[in-house]
Amino acid sequence: MNSGISQVFQRELTCPICLNYFIDPVTIDCGHSFCRPCFYLNWQDIPILTQCFECLKTTQQRNLKTNIRLKKMASRARKASLWLFLSSEEQMCGTHRETKKIFCEVDRSLLCLLCSSSLEHRYHRHCPAEWAAEEHREKLLKKMQSLWEKVCENQRNLNVETTRISHWKDYVNVRLEAIRAEYQKMPAFHHEEEKHNLEMLKKKGKDIFHRLHLSKAKMAHRREILRGTYAELMKMCHKPDVELLQAFGDILHRSESVLLHMPQPLNLELRAGPITGLRDRLNQFRVDITLPHNEANSHIFRRGDLRSICIGCDRQNAPHITATPTSFLAWGAQTFTSGKYYWEVHVGDSWNWAFGVCNKYWKGTNQNGNIHGEEGLFSLGCVKNDIQCSLFTTSPLTLQYVPRPTNHVGLFLDCEARTVSFVDVNQSSPIHTIPNCSFSPPLRPIFCCVHL
């Protein structure tokens, strides 16, 4: 920093972390200011509530806005430093003894006014050096913002894979137990099929576990590359204007290549083999489900012999999709207090649906049309995120890493065992059993379709 600028003025425009003039300064709750890049790099791995670097007061990380006035003052300070530098004897044009205040964008050099009009540079694009430096710095900041969004996206994906790894073995064991439980209800001659299906599921589970670790390693490596590139761009932003102008093009090109080929979370599907005779056994408890006339709508309608319900949003209804998620709920006319019951739902090839049973006190939606909490709701749902569809069950809310069922999905309700089980009818395979359900009879079937 130049001694010609007031020391007090310099101190007020200096980031306490990097000790350079502010670039894109943000002011946090306690009133202290930092460069946004410094704040990001130092607090990314810390929870939302953190401590100020200077006063140690607790502050929020959310909704950081640029301090425009501070940014303008820091820009003026840099311009003053640039002019002092260009006005020095060493920086004068050796040919014309004029100040080199013009920047040539073709050969990235500083020229005096007379040199910029020479035959060599006449047809090149020129601009004032002070203006070019700030414009280039703004381009860097814009690129840094895009890069940081990728840093955060990659970190979210890394967190997803880390969580999956920590829970994967337990999930596989739950799936194995569910299959064993189904075979215990089947005749003894299914023993070889059971053994084969369990061995295949174990092998698939181990393969996926290995792939998860590889995916996590790729994301961790990408995180270091992204953060390193971001720090490099930040360092370039802090360079004196002349150095920034001369080195700008190369670093921008390198940063763009880093944004390519971002690793994504794996699409996990732990497919179990078919269980022979599963549907025949469940059909012993088959019941007819009907909808009260006032609760039927265009998204949930009755099929054929009323032994199954069709659910889903027809793709032809796309013009009716709204920006605000809207849920369409319907309850079955039947109620259950004891016994075992089985029915099927035809979901076709749709997504953003859910169905199951609920306690008598579960209200569905509030006055704003939003779905209430999952307590008292025992359901299977399918949602689409980007290009992937995910299955989940409620009570508790749990992701199910099985292929998305198409056409028919079965529900088996056992009031005495306090369980709700879901079955992929086409694959003759169990999806999940919700154990230890906190039933509060009478129970009612419930169907939901969501337009997103």
Swiss-Prot record:
Example GO molecular function term? zinc ion binding
UniProt KW keywords: Metal-binding, Zinc, Zinc-finger
Zn finger (B box-type) start-end: 88-129
Question: Where does each RING-type zinc finger lie?
Answer: 15-56
Q: Mind telling me which GO cellular component terms the entry cites?
A: cytoplasm
Gene3D superfamilies found in the cross-reference section: 2.60.120.920, Classic Zinc Finger, Zinc/RING finger domain, C3HC4 (zinc finger)
Instruction: Tell whether Metal-binding is among the UniProt keywords.
Output: yes
Which terms under GO biological process does the entry name?
innate immune response; regulation of gene expression
User: Where does the B30.2/SPRY domain lie?
Assistant: 269-452
This protein's source sits in the domain of life called Eukaryota
Give the transmembrane region(s): none
Binding, Zn(2+): 93, 96, 115, 121
Q: Which PROSITE patterns match?
A: B302_SPRY (PS50188), ZF_BBOX (PS50119), ZF_RING_2 (PS50089)
Q: Does the keyword Nucleus apply?
A: no
Per the record, the similarity remark reads: Belongs to the TRIM/RBCC family.
User: What is this protein's name?
Assistant: Tripartite motif-containing protein 49D
| Protein's organism | Homo sapiens (Human)
Chain's gene name: TRIM49D1
